[in-house]
């Protein structure tokens, strides 16, 4: 079959590419695997997506959906070739309605651009992954993306009120809408959010907005070590505070950040905590003072306080530099996003230190302390060496097994993709895995949507 020719006939040549350069650019994400598709399709509307899937369904052609392509787990790698369907051109903010408290967007809208647009009107879309300047709403929905502020405000799923989805056979389904409360039928929205492109393709989303908090304060505190910072997280929450963010960092990450950004950026100390509070001005000031005193009581050394938006954003920018700082070390960063019950934070870091000694692989820990989602990154030297890679995989196996034994999860926001496929049955359990497969077969009987990922052998 002449796949490019057939698709060109359906969509027109301006939406179809077989260029080597284009196919290579759409062969993977930020993970280590890649595979060229046979053809790349640039959908511009729901009708384009519907036509492509109807054709692919009839002809048993694999279709891998791609948003911004900046995931960390190989979720958009077209393992079986076929068609990569890019939603990058579907990048319109269709509507923003303060009256209804919603925004209607296409999947290619960049998350940070949506935030800017709604904040200009005095509203907010809280989910804020570190890659918000690059990532798309469609990708966020596919992985149920989180971010630092999900402690108080929740993850992407908490903001999806409605979806337009094209099913594997090309039929278009709508579920939900502009209603902030709706219990009609099954929670189909919850089924598609986090489904990693394996059950259908989202072509439009209706997202919940909230009034933009009028004031905020940030406290960035340095501690003697990571356990002291982790214990402070518990102290803050036990005292009745619910910050919008609680971000923790270990010594390895801090040292890498000092090298990239300057030694003066982070005062001496081997643990670091960022606390953000938002709300009404008087309440924020009062709570900020209480937390400042609590940080001191818990052993914090230097505490930086920011009250203006510009100062607060400067602290967030430092936090967003952590991943880049770790890459600057020259080591390969295996970007893991495990989750443990909040009470196990200190145990997790102690286990990571033990694992580092046993394997000789450096481990850098930072992330969302408030919800137990810590990026436990293996920093590997000479990762291209097969023996080294095998040692790193063995270390990951030890880490994931420990996390699951403690009641945790192997991924909190990046998704499973290819990277965590070897551990999915262990993570889900036999019965849950079988239910996942049953749902997949019901919605995609020919298995054309994002094949080769965690539900396939």
Regions found by a protein language model. Give the residues of each.
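C-terminal substrate-recognition/cap domain of FAD-linked oxidoreductases
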Residues: 18-21, 26, 207, 211, ...
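N-terminal flexible segment immediately upstream of the FAD-binding catalytic core
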Residues: 1-54, 70-101, 130, 253-262, ...
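Short beta-alpha connecting loops at secondary-structure transitions
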Residues: 91, 98-101, 384-385, 419-425
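N-terminal accessory segments
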Residues: 1-30, 58-61, 294-312, 405-410, ...
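Conserved, mostly hydrophobic/aromatic
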Residues: 56, 197, 444
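Activity-critical C-terminal alpha-helical subdomain
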Residues: 171, 421-457
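FAD-binding subdomain of flavoenzyme oxidoreductases
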Residues: 92-96, 101-249, 449
